[in-house]
Design a protein with these regions (language model features):
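Extended, low-polarity transmembrane helix blocks
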Residues: 1-62, 81-91, 98-191, 207-218, ...
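Membrane-interface interhelical connector segments
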Residues: 62-74, 187-208
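Polar, glycosylation-prone regions of secreted, cell-surface, and some intracellular proteins
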Residues: 68, 75, 101-105
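Residue-level signal for alpha-helical context at structural boundaries
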Residues: 75, 201-202, 243, 263
Length: 301
């Protein structure tokens, strides 16, 4: 069932995607050479971050109760903070789509997701350290923060080289840790939905549903190690971005299509899995865009 919230989430995603591709058309067309396909994908980093933010925004205004419930209990005015975050998501999505004030918006975006980690997900993970999903949530939002700061580092390289360097290093280390952790989880629990391994089990009707977990782990593990060691880091980050982009289409878009007649909560969950995976792709591609193309320059980042 398509509720008004789910409808607005879908329309926002489609609208921002179309606008982002249009604005990025010159960068996409300019990608040439041996790594042309990856370069074309990297050119869409801003769009791949903006679109999920736009998808998330509507549910902060008229969405499920869990959005307001996620605000820490010690903070007053839960509806206000939910609406505030929705406005922030739309502002960041618009900035990244139009390529205006990217340094400011991506810096603030990184701070916002880091606050989510510190105020919401890390306390939950520490309260039950054996819960693997708690740490998956921590690394997910920490990776989103890293993607924002990778963009901020890229766009502050000329004016603040030292700040740019540590922001990109932070992003590289965070995404390395997340990729390695997620790879291990995929190998241990291949039946769970691939990419960012949260609670959802891959539906049995998806072809090769368990194999998807192993394939994801086989790509994430070497890519994470490459990022950690800073060896072929740009290719490693782009590979993670390409994997997550592919997973957004299959199985997550396929699951959304199959859920078109399902209860609104199931459709909302499917939309959120698409946005999560797509945003993780955008974060990895943002890091790739900030890293040097020439492997001999790895010492600078």
């Amino acid at each position: 069932m398509l509720s008004s919230t789910n409808l607005w989430m879908g329309l926002a995603g489609l609208g921002y995607f179309a606008a982002g591709v249009f604005v990025s058309r010159k960068e996409i067309a300019a990608a040439r050479g041996a790594g042309m396909r990856l370069d074309k994908l990297i050119a869409l980093a801003c769009t791949f971050i903006a679109v999920p933010l736009a998808i998330f925004a509507p549910e902060h205004f008229v969405g499920p109760q869990f959005v307001q419930d996620s605000v820490p209990s010690y903070m007053p005015w839960h509806p206000f903070w939910a609406h505030f975050v929705g406005c922030a998501l739309l502002a960041a999505a618009t900035s990244l789509t139009l390529r205006k004030f990217i340094r400011l918006s991506s810096t603030l975006l990184g701070i916002m997701f880091l606050l989510f980690v510190c105020m919401i997900f890390l306390p939950g993970a520490l309260s039950d350290p054996k819960d693997r999903f708690g740490w998956a949530f921590v690394l997910r939002d920490l990776s989103f923060s890293a993607g924002g700061w990778a963009l901020a580092g890229l766009y502050s390289r000329a004016s603040s080289p030292l700040q740019s360097k540590w922001m990109i290093v932070f992003a590289r280390i965070v995404l390395a840790i997340a990729a390695i952790y997620y790879a291990i989880e995929q190998f241990l629990h291949p039946e769970f939905a691939p990419g960012v391994p949260l609670e959802k089990i891959t539906p049995a009707w998806i072809p090769f549903h368990s194999l998807l977990g192993y394939i994801s782990g086989a790509i994430l593990l070497p890519a994470g190690i490459g990022l950690a060691l800073n060896k072929h880091a740009r290719t490693a980050a782009a590979s993670i971005g390409a994997l997550m982009t592919a997973l957004t289409l299959f199985p997550y878009l396929l699951i959304l299509i199959a859920d078109h007649g399902a209860p609104a909560a199931d459709v909302n969950e499917a939309l959120n899995y698409i946005a999560d995976t797509w945003l993780y792709a955008g974060a990895a591609l943002a890091l790739a865009s900030a890293l040097p193309r020439n492997p001999s320059h790895t010492e600078t980042t």
